[in-house]
């Protein structure tokens, strides 16, 4: 017999259930060699067809041999059908020629270390064994041991009923016959339900004929020919090209015979996207000049009048200010005059790119007093039958009024005194921000220096909520200030005692106690030192 191999060539571990393949006598694990032979009945090392497997070797005369009934011949043309046919015959309904090829010992694999099946196809058999052995034995530990014994017996004897009955009789006694019968049925179902297919054997190096290689190269050159997408005519077509020129020349004549349709021009942008504004006529210009807004009631002022308001903040798209900005002013319901942009241009003496955009929010009365709320104030320069007049003033006068209306802090206004421009009760009202673009060539350009913007008023919580869609944010988390130590000078005696106690503890931890002097015996005896 051959010597025992140090490691299995398949799993590279110490061989369990030492086995050898005949006739080459190469040593493997029993599980590894049986799995290998089911896929390819040749030796993994020397590629010699395996005739039998010797396993459970106790001595030179005591061992077990399992024969491989497949006669594998490399030179024959039926080498694939001879081994594959015995495993695929189960699907066709015919019994295989050698039944030990699919229900013999090589069809079963021992359990893994964790108690699961060694092969996925045997897992239903292991599940059945778990249920059946739990019914026959009392403890789960004993059932686990019997499960391993049953699977090892199947790996050695296969579905041999006589041998299984003889092996299981000392353990199952009167339950041996029904258990073996059910075990064989379950084992054959698991093995026969999934026939084992062999791995395709390699044919080695295949040499290609030179004639076939030349033909393939010609096909590759034909496929590499570039095709001009502009010239897709048939190369065999020999028709004259003049016919195509004549047909192309006649094409525009046929198109000219059709009635011409007016093509729509590019869309123009109006005030609303996707709609074309109608051409303004003389009546529409006059109506735009005298257009007035409908009066709106203000619940805060209860219908009282506070002064004249001229709104000149309309942009080119016709959008007005947000409702929250205008609603924050304590104003009255006055008609608003929208000036005509076409006639306002020639009124300015100087025309330049930097035109003056005036945002006149309110106007001060000569006495700097508010009119009574019960008496409405008529607009300046307008009467019942007359057309309202535009306020005409110089740029310097407007600058003075604008700075008087600008928002400022109450502390700054009080410190400045009444000598400052616009000092009065109306100077501290919250007004919206206004930006004035001044013509540099006009009068008073040096006062502004180009662009002039006042401080932006901070929005209130209600205004911010309306801008977010009436969604209120939860208040921010405020940091808690550190709690100081209790004051000794407090009137409460409990607080004074606690503060004094805290300071005493701090003083005690900061000072270190003095080390006591070591008492020594004059004779330096260890007994005296130990007693101390």
Swiss-Prot record:
Auto-ubiquitinated. It comes from the Viruses. Residues 286-295 have a biased composition (Basic residues). It is an enzyme of class 2 (transferase). Zn(2+) 2 binds at residues 24, 26, 43, 46. Keywords: Activator, DNA-binding, Early protein, Host-virus interaction, Inhibition of host innate immune response by virus, Inhibition of host IRF3 by virus, Inhibition of host mitotic exit by virus, Inhibition of host RLR pathway by virus, Metal-binding, Modulation of host cell cycle by virus, Modulation of host ubiquitin pathway by viral E3 ligase, Modulation of host ubiquitin pathway by virus, Repressor, Transcription, Transcription regulation, Transferase, Ubl conjugation, Ubl conjugation pathway, Viral immunoevasion, Zinc, Zinc-finger. A zinc finger (RING-type) spans 8-47. The keyword Ligase does not apply. One of its GO terms (molecular function) is zinc ion binding. Residues 206-391, 406-426, 461-498, 510-532 are annotated as: Disordered. It catalyses: S-ubiquitinyl-[E2 ubiquitin-conjugating enzyme]-L-cysteine + [acceptor protein]-L-lysine = [E2 ubiquitin-conjugating enzyme]-L-cysteine + N(6)-ubiquitinyl-[acceptor protein]-L-lysine. One of its GO terms (biological process) is symbiont-mediated disruption of host cell PML body. InterPro entries: Znf_C3HC4_RING-type (IPR018957), Znf_RING (IPR001841), Znf_RING/FYVE/PHD (IPR013083), Znf_RING_CS (IPR017907). CDD domains: RING-HC_EHV1-like (cd23130). Its EC number is 2.3.2.27. SMART domains: RING. PROSITE patterns: ZF_RING_1 (PS00518), ZF_RING_2 (PS50089). Residues 217-227, 234-243 have a biased composition (Acidic residues). Pfam families: zf-C3HC4 (PF00097). Zn(2+) 1 binds at residues 8, 11, 29, 32. PANTHER family: E3 UBIQUITIN-PROTEIN LIGASE TOPORS, TOP1 BINDING ARGININE_SERINE RICH PROTEIN, E3 UBIQUITIN LIGASE. Evades nuclear antiviral defenses triggered by dsDNA viruses. Acts during the initial stages of lytic infection and the reactivation of latent viral genome. Prevents the antiviral effect of nuclear bodies by degrading host PML and SP100. This is E3 ubiquitin-protein ligase ICP0. The gene is 63.
């Amino acid at each position: 017999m051959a010597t025992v191999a140090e490691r299995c060539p398949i799993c590279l571990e110490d061989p369990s259930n030492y086995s050898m393949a005949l006739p080459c006598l190469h040593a493997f694990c029993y599980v590894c060699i049986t799995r290998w032979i089911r896929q390819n009945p040749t030796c993994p090392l020397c590629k010699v067809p395996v005739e039998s497997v010797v396993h459970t070797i106790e001595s030179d005369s005591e061992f077990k041999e399992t024969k491989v009934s497949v006669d594998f011949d490399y030179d024959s043309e039926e080498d694939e059908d001879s081994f594959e046919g015995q495993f695929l015959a189960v699907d066709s309904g015919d019994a295989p020629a050698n039944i030990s090829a699919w229900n013999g010992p090589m069809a079963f694999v021992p359990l893994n270390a964790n108690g699961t099946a060694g092969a996925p196809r045997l897992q239903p058999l292991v599940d059945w064994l778990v249920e059946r052995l739990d019914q026959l034995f009392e403890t789960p530990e004993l059932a686990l041991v019997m499960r391993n014994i049953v699977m090892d017996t199947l790996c050695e004897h296969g579905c041999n009923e006589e041998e299984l009955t003889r092996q299981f009789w000392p353990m199952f006694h009167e339950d041996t016959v029904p258990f073996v019968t059910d075990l064989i049925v379950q084992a054959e179902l698991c093995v026969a339900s999934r026939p084992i297919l062999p791995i395709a054997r390699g044919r080695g190096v295949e040499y290609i004929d030179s004639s076939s290689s030349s033909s393939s190269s010609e096909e590759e050159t034909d496929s590499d020919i570039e095709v001009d997408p502009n010239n897709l005519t048939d190369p065999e077509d020999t028709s004259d090209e003049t016919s195509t020129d004549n047909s192309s020349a006649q094409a525009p004549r046929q198109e000219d015979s059709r009635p011409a349709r007016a093509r729509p021009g590019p869309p123009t942008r109006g005030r609303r996207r996707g709609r074309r504004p109608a051409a303004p006529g003389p009546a529409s210009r006059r109506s735009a000049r005298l257009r007035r807004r409908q009066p709106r009631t203000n619940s805060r002022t209860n219908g009282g009048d506070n002064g004249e308001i001229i709104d000149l903040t309309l942009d080119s798209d016709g959008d007005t200010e947000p409702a929250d900005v205008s609603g924050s002013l304590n104003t009255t319901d006055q008609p608003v005059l929208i000036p005509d942009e076409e006639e306002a241009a020639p009124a300015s003496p100087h025309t330049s790119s930097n035109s003056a955009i005036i945002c006149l929010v309110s106007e001060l009365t000569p006495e700097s007093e508010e009119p009574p709320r019960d008496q409405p104030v008529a607009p300046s320069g307008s009467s019942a039958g007359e057309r309202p007049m535009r306020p005409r003033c110089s740029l310097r006068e407007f600058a003075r009024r604008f700075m008087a209306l600008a928002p400022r802090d109450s502390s700054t206004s009080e410190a400045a005194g009444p000598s400052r421009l616009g000092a009065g009760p109306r100077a501290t009202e919250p007004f919206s921000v206004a930006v004035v673009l001044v013509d540099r060539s006009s009068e008073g350009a040096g006062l502004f220096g180009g662009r002039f913007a006042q401080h932006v008023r901070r929005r209130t919580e209600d205004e911010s909520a309306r801008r977010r869609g009436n969604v209120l944010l939860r208040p921010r988390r405020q940091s808690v200030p550190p709690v100081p130590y209790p004051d000794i000078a407090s009137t409460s005696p409990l607080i004074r005692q606690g503060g004094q106690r805290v300071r005493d503890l701090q003083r005690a931890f900061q000072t270190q106690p003095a080390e006591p002097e070591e008492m020594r015996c004059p004779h330096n005896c260890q007994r005296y030192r130990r007693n101390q």
